[in-house]
Amino acid sequence: MTAGYRHHVFKLLLFLHLLAAIFAVGPLVGAATTASRALRRPDADAATSAARLVRLYSYVSIVVVILGMGLMSQKAPWDSSEEVAQIGDPWIWLSLLLWVCAMAVALGLLVPSLTRAAVEIGGGGSPSALVGRVAAAGGAIGLLYAVIVLLMVYQPGG
């Protein structure tokens, strides 16, 4: 593979990785961090919609990871003798660990809490006991992704 071709493949994968991150992680963090509004109103439809968005964009974020792995395996255009990164680089495995944590919070805590809140609101009950949990989960997801971006930019140990 020629250096020019390799450079174009690298740029294409970088573009797709960033585009996927913007269009998948952005809406995920937005939905997660604002989901508690649906419980404060209370609005069952908004809670159901927030749960659906968080679930959908959590799964779509897998594309970001796949593209990142593809990008990582490319030869660095600035030094064709080495790969962009390796799985053992601290910033890579820490980012993956934090992404798994964000997925666990989103799918294991936030989505079930929003679904339960929607049922409670629909039944005429109050979801007040879940507001704090939903707000904390949304904040945690936002913080986890902010740290992932920080790791991607500064690449400590890489």
Locate predicted features.
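Polytopic transmembrane helical bundles with strong interfacial aromatic enrichment
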Residues: 2-158
